[in-house]
């Protein structure tokens, strides 16, 4: 997921869009860890300084959107945030949109967002924004198998951020979408490694 994140962030920058940040999965995990274990010391915690910088960038308008691919655990039709004892078995997409004061949530199984995710994002946003954010559905292709969630989640995010380049994929085109994603990542890695070689 992080290689696709890098390639998509690069596509955004190439399109002149600098106001969108796509979080690394480890950055999202750090926000979750702070919420679970250090919520009272978030504003002082040294290891949280880069997380606070992202929040400050939301506050001052540097970023208008922050997107993340989130690993969740589905059990008996309910969704929970993953942790070290219950690793994720499904990927969803979250986009914080300051311009519309909304949190867009895309799940290819159409399950509601985990309560802990809702609470965590409210907690984090409360440190950096004053308005109330409303939850809304993020358009996503519905999943009919047990293994396409990463590609569907990734394309849902890409479609929301760069719709002309990334249309939502029809369910029957998941294999082609995987190939297209691989080509995008290889192209990105080839270009960035050749730039570094000059």
Question: PLM features: residue spans?
Answer:
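Enzymes acting in ubiquitin/UBL processing and closely related pathways
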Residues: 1-16, 84-198
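Cysteine protease catalytic domains with a Cys-His-Asp triad
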Residues: 1-92, 96-102
